[in-house]
Amino acid sequence: MSGHSKWATTKHKKAALDAKRGKLFAKLIKNVEVAARTGGGDPDGNPTLYDAIQKARKNSVPQDNIERARKRGAGEEAGGADWQTIMYEGYGPNGVAVLVECLTDNRNRAAGEVRTAMTRNGGSMADAGSVAYLFNRKGVVLLPKNGLSEDDVLSAVLEAGAEEINDLGESYEILTEPSDLVDVRKALQAEGIEYDSAETNFLASVNVPLDADGARKLFKLIDVLEDCDDVQNVFANFDVSDEVLEEVNA
């Protein structure tokens, strides 16, 4: 679990600095638009929209882009697309289970992109339900340490519903039930504790340990999937040790 989380944290730091930044912006803007359409355009009354806007800001998406996406979703401005959330399931190299979350206005295009990415990079598609049972939906909050101890964080969020705190090296990861995510985020804010993101993700209940070769193959598949315009998130049930992660990143 910790190896997977450290990899994801490192990957997203790099994504903010390289050519994938444009794709990341597009995904974050899409999240804002969909959140506004689903729960209304007022962030104070729509926690999902609030968190989508905060995440976009943290990743340096221009405020004007964020506001236009909010207005499109809320129907205050023309041009909003009919986005659909679709989950695809499959297997990656070494039998790793893969969940691909798409947000698309063209179901056939999304399915084709995901299938091509999987089959060309050592993966295969699976029937609905084949791997989804290996994952649980959880609220996940990431926050920089900023001199905070694990006890500092725990005392701030325990009564709000935090289930687990993981030390990821430079940051902490707080896990909650999805229904407690907003309360945990608000508890951090009440204590003046800065956080990087608060969102729901699919976390694996069982992980497949990978060596460096297996990790490289899987990371390539995930990178190709995430490069697809319709793909918002990719979840996989793998774990890598710190040593393997260092070898892969060397």
Swiss-Prot record:
It comes from the Bacteria. InterPro entries: Integrase-like_N (IPR017856), TACO1_YebC-like_2nd/3rd_dom (IPR048300), TACO1_YebC_N (IPR049083), Transcrip_reg_TACO1-like (IPR002876), Transcrip_reg_TACO1-like_dom3 (IPR026564), YebC-like (IPR029072). It is found in: Cytoplasm. GO terms for biological process: regulation of DNA-templated transcription. Keywords: Cytoplasm, DNA-binding, Transcription, Transcription regulation. The keyword Metal-binding does not apply. Its main location: cytoplasm. GO terms for molecular function: DNA binding. SUPFAM superfamilies: YebC-like. GO terms for cellular component: cytosol. Gene3D superfamilies: 1.10.10.200, 3.30.70.980. Belongs to the TACO1 family. This is Probable transcriptional regulatory protein SACE_2018.
